[in-house]
Amino acid sequence: KNIMATAVLKAIRNKHKKANIIVITSHPDVFIDNPNVNKVLVHGTVSGIYKDYIAGKDNKVFITDPYSASDYLTESKNLIEIWCNLCDVPYKDELPEIFLSKSEIEYFAPFYKLDKPIMVIQPCGGPIEQPLKYNWVRDVPPVVMQDIINAFKDEYAIVHIKRQDQMTYENTTAALDSWRSIAVLLMMSKRRVLIDSSAQHIAAALGLPSMVLWIGTSSKVFGYEMHANVDASTPDKEINLDHMYYQRLPLFEDISKCPYT
């Protein structure tokens, strides 16, 4: 979401060209060297925000949740467009942006110098605090991922983006590092097989067309036209819609609820 927010930030800057833009975020490293932001504050660590930045100031405050918008719940528009609409700024097909310094690239690149061209996979996603090691709504079934690995392992060095607690695959090398080092890895890769998670947003920000596998979430809402978006087949079983959520499926759900056999 923070990476997608850089596209919204660009749209805000396009409308408010002379504004002093302050971003409050839990992921400040996403906005390093971004020319569209003047200052970054870390969410939950700064007091006096109202006194210092709002009271008596001629400003606009953008505190919106696109996940509660009608167009998101009905899956009728891309999330970036939805977010721009909520902020009352024109959406002109802005894409996420990542700004890597030369020193960052030179530091991380040697870690990914392998003996074959690099193919990056991200079969599972989700934040560190997510309790599910496998989330059927977004994660690739292990048997499918293993078939992909087997097909490419002789030609490519396969680097696996994963959390520490997620499953590993033979004939892969784990990439357990910051998202900025992952950005360098993606820049160095020749092929990418990703899911609806951080790496596909980083790839879009870097202008790297990738194959993205979609299981339960919508490529229309979360995806990018530059990618080869592959939708899952129709479920074998009827999806249980008798739940407490406002959207068709939650972003995280246990394997016991999976409608595929």
Predicted regions span which residues?
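Catalytic machinery of carbohydrate-active enzymes
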Residues: 1-261
